[in-house]
Amino acid sequence: HSLNITVTNFKNTKGSLRVCITDQKNNFLKDCLFSQIVSIEDDNVSLSFENLKNGTYAVSVYHDENNNGILETSGLFGFPSEPFGFSKNPSVRFGPPSFKKSAIIVNDDKNITIKLN
């Protein structure tokens, strides 16, 4: 199956978009089953992952503005200083969402939109 992702709300076109798909709730935000690095040319970016098997997945993205491959954080609590987002666009206040809050079921071709925070 295909998972078509549109990421919105870019503030600039510096750097790149880094996308991670996982199917492991215990490794959410750590290990990517599939990943892509995409250049940013507009305030929206669209990309696709092909040949996904039926399953439950979560998608995390971040705008790597300085293109160093690391999600920059700041402050005492280490909140991301680069824009980020997750499938299902869960509320993010006191840390990243759980796998369950970001999980999507892929059993056919699917389109999702992720809004950067």
PLM feature segments, named:
Residues L3-F10, V19:
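A short, amphipathic beta-strand motif
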Residues N12-N26:
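Short, ordered, surface-exposed loop/turn motifs in non-cytosolic proteins
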Residues K14, N54-T56, D109:
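Extracellular Ig-like/FN3 beta-sandwich strand-entry sites
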Residues V38-D43, V106:
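Short proline/glycine- and polar residue-rich coil/turn motifs
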Residues D43, S48, K53-T56:
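A glycine-anchored, Pro-Gly-centered beta-turn/N-cap motif
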Residues Y57-V61:
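A short tyrosine-centered beta-strand micro-motif
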Residues E65-E72:
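Acidic, glycine-anchored loop motifs typical of Ca2+
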Residues E82-N117:
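Extracellular beta-sheet/turn segments enriched in Thr/Pro/Gly and aliphatic residues
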